[in-house]
UniProtKB/Swiss-Prot annotation:
GO biological process, one term: negative regulation of proteolysis
Main localization of the protein described in the UniProt heading: secreted
Signal peptide: 1-25
Function: Protease-inhibitor that contains multiple distinct protease inhibitor domains. Probably has serine protease- and metalloprotease-inhibitor activity.
SUPFAM superfamilies hit by this protein: BPTI-like (SSF57362), Elafin-like (SSF57256), Immunoglobulin (SSF48726), Kazal-type serine protease inhibitors (SSF100895), TIMP-like (SSF50242)
Glycan-carrying positions: 497
Pfam families the record matches: Ig_3, Kunitz_BPTI, WAP
Name this protein carries in UniProt: WAP, Kazal, immunoglobulin, Kunitz and NTR domain-containing protein 1
Residues in NTR domain copies: 413-544
Domain notes: The second BPTI/Kunitz inhibitor domain is able to inhibit trypsin. It has however no activity toward chymotrypsin, elastase, plasmin, pancreatic kallikrein, lung tryptase, plasma kallikrein, thrombin, urokinase or tissue plasminogen activator.
WAP domain boundaries: 29-82
The keyword Secreted appears for this protein: yes
Disulfide bonds: 36-69, 52-73, 56-68, 62-78, 120-150, 124-143, 132-161, 211-267, 303-355, 310-338, 330-351, 363-413, 372-396, 388-409, 421-493, 424-495, 435-544
Species lineage: Eukaryota, Metazoa, Chordata, Craniata, Vertebrata
């Protein structure tokens, strides 16, 4: 029968086309399974989660669970692969993170559409445990440091915290001798340009909270919304979180506001010199206002938490403001309706007016620089670090957490007080200490790094003069700064106490394996003119040689 003969070539062509189309669906050699976010949906572009730093040219440059995708910088970055709900078949066996390793610091295994993937941690504990990291920044706690390391694709480790002592002095000098500081003169902790002010928007409206901060180096800004949960979500610049966007300049914009969006939004700004946290209260109001409060009825009862049992669940997606004794200010709580009434306030300002008596604690306010140009050195108290720190005040629109001297700041605010330490006793007087020491210098302390676990630390000294140097060649090398190792230090009451004097010091110590070392027997005193002159005279008269001959 001749009829079937033409059918065979057609069947062969159909099978060939089918096989070709099937092979096109297979991934290219070296490519990883899954899709890029914008391939799955045109609205899911790779955002700044990659920070445009993890560049790649193909999937082979990324981890097995990642794809090389176009990012907002016009380049390509490694990001977690996405899978459509009706896409590649998922193995019938349940996916598990068991045995799946996430080598990047701050990343955890998560199951994404049936596959284990590594995701950067985006929630951290609310309790502070300040951590100094190897990138020179201070983090709110260890979790924040790990999350930042994952975000930047780095490895960060904990280092001893630095104490910057070079500027400003504890008290300004006379006006005629004090130079006007500039914001870029020295490392400065973050400070706000303007004090945070409460905002209120109607349902469906847009709110903008701007954490406008100064500091040197420029501070990094993150946001979080305070909640009653153990962990808060960290919101970073150039990312979207539901109806919330954090811009590249640290501005939080909330679109289509809903009642549940009301609350305290906390800005955290940090740099190598310090850390700042400021609360921005946001109230969301219903357009159809409920019954107005009778102005003749005191609202103090509204400040207290509900003690009676309420029938039924809380009002869905509705929050009210009440006084929180732990914070000392107002915060949002789920609205509970008992007997048809809800206890609480619609706005943060109404709650503060009714429940907070007096001007409030000035020491709890963030440091505010202000927008003017009349720069002045000032001191502010940090309730997080529990210490006073310097900042530059512009001369206007600050707040009460603004002191002319460190002493006045410490007198007004709760700086931890420890019993006074006994004065460090010198094992030898000046002449004998000079002869027993390998070096004697005059210098100003610029930085101290404490290492309590090793009972030591490091002191960095700006050299004014080298009086004696038997082993390091400081004058020959023209050394301007000297790093001195502190050995056997009890940091509760350190001896010698290198931080006891603000001005120049006379420092004498040993040299061990080419390193300048101070221990409990080393000589450290204020560099008075009389003391320095005495050392020079002893060296000129070669008193140490005579002393050695006498001892021999």
């Amino acid at each position: 029968m001749p009829a079937p003969q033409p059918f065979l070539p057609l069947l062969f062509v159909f099978v060939l086309i089918h096989l070709t189309s099937e092979t096109n669906l297979l991934p290219d050699p070296g490519s990883h399974p899954g899709m890029c976010p914008n391939e799955l949906s045109p609205h899911l572009w790779v955002d700044a989660q990659s920070t445009c730093e993890r560049e790649c040219t193909g999937d082979q440059d990324c981890a097995a669970s990642e794809k090389c995708c176009t990012n907002v910088c016009g380049l390509q970055s490694c990001v977690a692969a996405r899978f459509p709900s009706g896409g590649p078949a998922v193995p019938e066996t349940a996916a598990s993170c068991e045995g799946f390793q996430c080598p990047q610091q701050g990343s955890d295994c998560d199951i994404w559409d049936g596959q284990p993937v590594c995701r950067c941690r985006d929630r951290c504990e609310k309790e502070p445990s300040f951590t100094c990291a190897s990138d020179g920044l201070t983090y709110y706690n260890r979790c924040y440091m790990d999350a930042e390391a994952c975000l930047r694709g780095l490895h960060l480790h904990v280092v001893p915290c630095k104490h910057i002592l070079s500027w400003p002095p504890s008290s300004p000098g006379p006006p005629e001798t004090t130079a006007r500081p500039t914001p870029g003169a020295a490392p400065m902790p973050p400070a706000l340009y303007n004090s945070p002010s409460p905002q209120a928007v109607h349902v469906g409206g847009t709110a903008s909270l701007h954490c406008d901060v100064s500091g040197r180096p420029p501070p990094a800004v993150t946001w979080e919304k305070q909640s009653h949960q153990r962990e808060n979500l960290i919101m970073r610049p150039d990312q979207m979180y539901g109806n919330v966007v954090v811009t590249s300049i640290g501005q939080l914009v909330l679109y289509n506001a809903q009642l549940e969006d009301a609350g305290l939004y906390t800005c955290t700004a940090r740099n190598a010199a310090g850390l700042l946290r400021a609360d921005f209260p946001l109230s969301v109001l219903q357009r159809a206002t409920t019954q107005d409060r009778d102005p003749g009825i005191p609202a103090l009862a509204e400040c207290q938490a509900d003690t009676q049992a309420c029938v039924g669940p809380p009002t869905p997606h509705h929050v009210l403001w009440r006084f929180d004794p732990q914070r000392g200010s107002c915060m949002t709580f789920p609205a509970l309706r008992c007997d048809g009434a809800a206890r609480g306030f619609e706005t943060y300002e109404a709650c503060q007016q009714a429940c907070v008596r007096g001007p409030g604690d000035v020491c709890a306010l963030p440091a505010v620089q202000g927008p003017c140009q009349g720069w002045e050195p000032r001191w502010a108290y940090s309730p997080l670090l529990q210490q006073c720190h310097p900042f530059v005040y512009s001369g206007c629109e600050g707040n009460s957490n603004n002191f002319e001297t460190r002493e006045s700041c410490e007198d007004a605010c709760p700086v931890p007080r420890t019993p006074p330490c006994r004065a460090c006793r010198l094992k030898s007087k000046l002449a004998l200490s000079l002869c027993r020491s390998d070096f004697a210098i005059v210098g100003r302390l610029t930085e101290v790094l404490e290492e309590p676990e090793a009972a030591g630390g490091i002191a960095r000294v700006a050299l004014d003069d080298v009086l004696k140097d038997d082993k390091m060649g400081l004058k020959f090398l023209g050394t301007k700064y000297l790093e001195v190792t502190l050995s056997g230090m009890d940091w509760a009451c350190p001896c010698p106490n290198v931080t006891a004097v603000d001005g120049p010091l006379v420092i004498m110590g040993e040299v061990r394996e080419g390193v300048a070392v101070l221990d409990a027997n080393s000589y450290v005193r204020a560099a008075s003119e009389k003391r320095v002159k005495k050392i020079v005279e002893l060296l000129e008269k070669k008193a140490c040689e005579l002393l050695n001959r006498f001892q021999d």
